[in-house]
Design a protein with these regions (language model features):
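Carbohydrate-active catalytic/glycan-binding domains of CAZyme proteins
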Residues: 1-298
Length: 298
């Protein structure tokens, strides 16, 4: 099955996201048949269900962009809690529910990791089992995770500005469309490491590549632009290969508001030189466009 993890906007809300995370999945051979597995993690009491965290009583402490990785048959949720220390939770099943393991343990300066928030965590389990976390808001950093715990950040492993916030012509980061804003998502394709992120020109998902997980990274282009250009109208997402086809998962705005985002997906192609040609934003999902040469019943 294919699983999607993300923050959860409430319809008609005046705020981003919610105090719960949900998971959706579909069979790899039927990508139009999605089911919701319900709440997988929460930071507030929810009816008969207690909070999964005991340090998030404030109403403004809600769940933003998470990530989930699998290692040794366990599924690890990396939760970004606004205005609170982030944490890692674990499950035996990809759909959860996830049980709290621990807050992050780290010696990185609070200035770098935003007082332990670890904003927009993206996690990569490499082929050799080593695990890396990439984070940041208006400044990026990465570090290695101790796989004995999956929540401890290894000492002296932090690298700042993995994607720069000021122009750096050596790496091709020379305009606002290339510089870092937020939304790290690491992937490995063959021997190449990709870091997908939201640049200062927010509506896009840009990407950079390196031959090492620790960089240095080189700007390669953008994958999709969700078509808005106003404050807060940024994009989050990543790429995945399903049945031999690569896709970009991302979100777009709904009904002219930035607070009710909806998930989208487009087919992409990774060329032999590692570049990804930009694709158009659509609402097709996994369907193909209508054939203009065939009658379509409606």
């Amino acid at each position: 099955r294919v699983y999607i993890y993300g923050s959860h906007d409430r319809a008609g809300s005046d705020d981003f996201c919610d105090y719960v995370l949900k998971c959706w999945s579909a069979p790899v051979n039927d990508l139009n048949n999605w089911v919701c597995h319900g709440v997988t993690f929460r930071v507030k009491p929810d009816g008969d269900f207690p909070s999964d965290t005991d340090w998030t009583p404030d109403k403004n402490q809600i769940l933003f962009a998470p990530d989930v990785v699998c290692r040794n048959g366990k599924y690890y949720l990396y939760a970004y809690i606004v205005n609170a220390t982030g944490c890692v939770a674990v499950s035996d099943r990809p759909e959860g529910p996830f049980t709290l393991l621990s807050k992050y343990k780290y010696t990185i300066s609070d200035e770098i990791c935003c007082n332990g928030w670890f904003i927009d965590p993206g996690v990569l389990v490499d082929d050799d089992g080593r695990t890396y976390i990439y984070c940041g808001y208006e400044r990026s950093f990465m570090a290695e995770v101790d796989t004995d715990t999956m929540y401890t950040i290894k000492d002296n492993s932090c690298i700042e500005h993995i994607i720069p916030i000021t122009t750096d012509n050596d790496g091709g980061f020379d305009t606002e469309e290339t510089l870092f804003f937020e939304a790290c998502s690491p992937r490995k394709v063959g021997d190449t490491y990709y870091l997908i992120y939201s640049p200062k020109r927010g509506p896009r998902l840009a990407y950079a590549t390196s031959d090492k997980p620790t960089g240095p990274f080189k700007y390669r282009g953008y994958i999709v632009d969700n078509g808005v250009d106003y404050p807060g109208g940024n994009d989050h997402g990543s790429i995945a290969q399903i049945n031999g086809q690569w896709y970009i998962f991302y979100h777009r705005m709904t009904n002219g508001t930035i607070m009710s985002r909806r998930a989208c997906v487009e087919k992409i192609e990774i060329l032999p030189d590692g570049t990804i040609p930009p694709v158009e934003m659509t609402s097709l999902g996994f369907e193909d466009s209508l054939d203009p040469y065939r009658i379509t019943e409606a």
